[in-house]
């Protein structure tokens, strides 16, 4: 168990100063360098005399200087707001307007001119590092102080800043490094793929820094080159893979993504979206000896609140894979529309309680009051997810409340339809979306389909392919759930965080 993130990093700077903490295609930085660089950057930040505990926006990609700046800000007593280099200018402006940061640190060239907020450039960070300024920690982030603030997409289009405290982070990190499901080794060698602006990134950097491991990052230029990206990943000595399931699906398009070519890769950690039976089955075929961990949780409950090791037996017997045993310190409940706790097996909304629950959304008391509350004397959060608990306290996922539609008198989970279609042996990926009429009622269901390699060539017309897919799933899919139209694509759009972008597809079919 660790009691302070920075104390842990500082300890490794003493005991394994020359061990790499960061590796980008062979360009390495050690724990000793991270201490010296973060001390120097923290001294620079202190010299600016910012308002105590005020948040600082950090703009950049998956670089070492981002990591060193995050550590420096924690030492200096400031929460950091990670903003990815690929963010749209409108989103950056919205984040600045809401967060009111006292400073912007631009590790990459900042695309906007902001009046009234000082900006520190990469050249100033580099100069501070060269100066090697000593630093005495007297006011670092502690306890309920905000450690980081990650902005998620709001339903109104306005992003919401989720405040995660040092205590929240410790609750998550200690669970992850101690829980048998994750089985994190000492000095873990982790792939650092999800951007820092996505809280899934915490699942790789927090346990790695807590256990003295190495982060293997990829340069941003590589991420846009699909073929080169996965050729490079296959050559990395990573032992643990952390990503959304969608990113793993992309990786499996490369023949090099297999146990024979990547023998060091033994653990897969998934979070951020639902892990399908189809993806898990394919992964077991590629990596027969690997451990596949399915984790679940919203950003508001610090990355994940439950986890479970997926077995071949689960893949063979479940239509939707379980999402885990809740964390011991985070009692999780299922409630009905009136807020009453439901019994085992009953489906309702998943709520999470305990020390990993955020204090709320930054400078947004209205949205905070809607989502955060007290349950059984504990801080609690409405996940907006449908689920149930088995008698063995395993959490089962049933979809999103906001992706639940009423069609032809039936209440339908869009994700349930997608899961059923994904069971077809011809389908690589499927997403169900509703088309609305002028009265905003569901007119019909459509499905976006990516078929497996070689499937299209077996059919003369798409109509015949559609009939074949429908026939392949009709035995386990209710007729009223079957989409009336299938739209075939070579790929499905992903959000910057690597999830399938369902909202974009819904907007597309409704001409929004």
From Swiss-Prot:
Keywords: ATP-binding, Cytoplasm, Ligase, Nucleotide-binding. The keyword Cytoplasm applies. Pathway: Cell wall biogenesis; lipoteichoic acid biosynthesis. It is found in: Cytoplasm. One of its GO terms (cellular component) is cytoplasm. ATP binds at residues 152-153, 294-299, 385, 397-400, 499. Belongs to the ATP-dependent AMP-binding enzyme family. DltA subfamily. One of its GO terms (molecular function) is ATP binding. The lineage of its organism: Bacteria, Bacillati, Bacillota, Bacilli, Lactobacillales. The keyword Cell inner membrane does not apply. Catalyzes the first step in the D-alanylation of lipoteichoic acid (LTA), the activation of D-alanine and its transfer onto the D-alanyl carrier protein (Dcp) DltC. In an ATP-dependent two-step reaction, forms a high energy D-alanyl-AMP intermediate, followed by transfer of the D-alanyl residue as a thiol ester to the phosphopantheinyl prosthetic group of the Dcp. D-alanylation of LTA plays an important role in modulating the properties of the cell wall in Gram-positive bacteria, influencing the net charge of the cell wall. It comes from Streptococcus pyogenes serotype M3 (strain ATCC BAA-595 / MGAS315). This is D-alanine--D-alanyl carrier protein ligase. PROSITE patterns: AMP_BINDING. It comes from the Bacteria.
């Amino acid at each position: 168990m660790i009691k302070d993130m920075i104390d842990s990093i500082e300890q490794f700077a003493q005991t394994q100063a020359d061990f790499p903490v960061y590796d980008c295609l062979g360009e390495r930085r050690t724990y000793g360098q991270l201490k010296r660089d973060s001390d120097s950057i923290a001294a620079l930040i202190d010299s600016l005399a910012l308002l105590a505990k005020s948040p600082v926006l950090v703009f950049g990609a998956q670089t070492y200087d981002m990591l060193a700046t995050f550590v420096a800000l924690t030492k200096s007593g400031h929460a950091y707001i990670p903003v990815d280099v690929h963010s749209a200018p409108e989103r950056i402006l919205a984040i600045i307007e809401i967060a009111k940061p006292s400073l912007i640190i631009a590790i990459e060239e900042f695309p906007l001119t902001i009046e009234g907020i000082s900006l520190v450039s990469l050249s100033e960070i580099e100069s501070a590092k060269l100066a090697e300024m000593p630093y005495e920690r007297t006011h670092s982030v502690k306890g309920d102080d905000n450690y980081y603030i990650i902005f998620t997409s709001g339903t109104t289009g306005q992003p919401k800043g989720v405040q995660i405290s040092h205590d929240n982070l410790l609750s998550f990190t200690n669970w992850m490094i101690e829980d048998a499901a994750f089985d994190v080794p000492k000095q873990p060698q982790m792939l650092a793929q999800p951007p820092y602006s996505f809280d899934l990134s915490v699942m790789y950097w927090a346990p790695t820094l807590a256990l003295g491991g190495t982060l293997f990052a990829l340069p941003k230029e590589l991420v846009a080159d699909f073929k080169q990206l996965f050729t490079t990943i296959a050559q990395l000595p990573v032992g643990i893979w952390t990503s959304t399931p969608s990113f793993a699906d992309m990786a499996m398009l490369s023949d090099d993504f297999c146990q024979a070519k990547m023998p060091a890769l033994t653990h897969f950690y998934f979070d951020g979206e639902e892990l399908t039976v189809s993806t898990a089955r394919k992964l077991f075929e590629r990596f027969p000896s690997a451990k596949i961990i399915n984790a679940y949780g919203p950003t508001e409950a610090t990355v994940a609140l439950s986890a479970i090791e997926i077995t071949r037996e689960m893949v063979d017997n479940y239509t939707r894979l379980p999402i885990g045993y809740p964390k011991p310190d985070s009692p999780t409940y299922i409630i009905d529309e009136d807020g009453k706790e439901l019994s085992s097996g009953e489906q309702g909304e998943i709520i999470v309680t305990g020390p990993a629950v955020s204090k709320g959304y930054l400078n947004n008391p209205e949205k905070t009051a809607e989502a955060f509350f007290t349950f059984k004397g504990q801080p609690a959060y409405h996940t907006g997810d449908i689920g149930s608990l088995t008698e063995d306290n395993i959490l089962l996922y049933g979809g999103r409340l906001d992706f639940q539609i009423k069609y032809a008198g039936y209440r339908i989970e869009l994700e349930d339809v997608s899961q059923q279609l994904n069971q077809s042996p011809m389908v690589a990926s499927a997403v169900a979306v509703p088309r609305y009429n002028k009265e905003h009622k569901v007119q019909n269901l459509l499905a976006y389909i990516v078929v497996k390699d070689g499937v299209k060539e077996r059919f003369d017309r798409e109509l015949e392919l559609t009939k074949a897919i429908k026939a392949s799933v009709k035995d386990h899919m209710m007729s009223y759930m079957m989409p009336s139209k299938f739209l075939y694509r070579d790929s499905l759009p992903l959000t910057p965080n690597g999830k399938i972008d369902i909202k974009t597809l819904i907007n597309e079919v409704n001409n929004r």
